[in-house]
């Protein structure tokens, strides 16, 4: 009777799926209130004007307008939303 001994079993072969983090709305893009701008772990980007931060550090728009990224003197990058009224002027 033909027979093949059982091969060893590998302990590798697992990997978790990516978490889909990163910038979702880029500088100059239009957003409405509640739109997610950045998903992140920790504060790589900080909330600026008209931007809120969720408990998982997600940044989201508080008003309708355009997204703006700005680096300040303390080397922190802030994400702001310039309201649609100001952007039109």
From Swiss-Prot:
Gene3D superfamilies: 2.40.50.100. Transmembrane segments: none annotated. It holds the Pfam family Ribosomal_L27. One of its GO terms (cellular component) is cytosolic large ribosomal subunit. The keyword Secreted does not apply. Keywords: Ribonucleoprotein, Ribosomal protein. The keyword Ribonucleoprotein applies. Residues 1-24 are annotated as: Disordered. GO terms for biological process: translation. It comes from the Bacteria. GO terms for molecular function: structural constituent of ribosome. HAMAP family: Ribosomal_bL27. Belongs to the bacterial ribosomal protein bL27 family. This is Large ribosomal subunit protein bL27. The lineage of its organism: Bacteria, Pseudomonadati, Pseudomonadota, Alphaproteobacteria, Hyphomicrobiales. The gene is rpmA.
């Amino acid at each position: 009777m033909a027979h093949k001994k059982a091969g060893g079993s590998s302990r590798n072969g697992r990997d978790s799926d990516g978490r889909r983090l990163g910038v979702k709305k880029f500088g100059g893009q239009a957003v409405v209130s509640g739109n997610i701008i950045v998903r992140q772990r920790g504060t790589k980007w900080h909330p600026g004007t008209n931007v809120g931060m969720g408990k998982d550090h997600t940044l989201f728009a508080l008003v309708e307008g355009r997204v703006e990224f700005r680096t300040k003197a303390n080397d922190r990058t802030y994400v702001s939303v310039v309201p649609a009224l100001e952007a039109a002027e």
